[in-house]
Amino acid sequence: MKILKRILLLMCMIFAFTSCSLLFPNSGPEVTTINTPASFTRAQRSAYVEGATVGVEKAIRSKLLQRNWKVSSRATGNETFAIVFDQLNIDKYSDGGFISSTYYEYTGYVSIFDVRNNERLCVYNFTKESLGDLLEGIEKAVIEVEKSMR
């Protein structure tokens, strides 16, 4: 009987530890830094977005405008950085409930390039992310780039 109680207690402890570990999600998006950018000034905080859909591009533009970046939808020659979606897949899900909702999941990877010397600065791989999580990863990559601002 004591052995059975210990086995049940052990199973309850394992269940408690595994369910409590779900309360602490990962710390955020993983951005891989490849090269450090050459130093730049606040006036050179400009980028263009390439390879994104119109909705994603508008969301990136509004997010970076909050950080005082100038963002355009195509290269005009005045930009310092390029945000390039090397791959972007969008999966659309809708539930069949009384009030139908549509969900989008984004998969792919995005790179930030320094247009002045054509170097890839950082890469953000994302899998089944919401638009908010995707923007958070791009913002984290931009923060890494901003560390070289003088």
Describe these PLM feature segments.
Residues 27-28, 66-67, 77-128, 132:
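Surface-exposed short loop/turn segments
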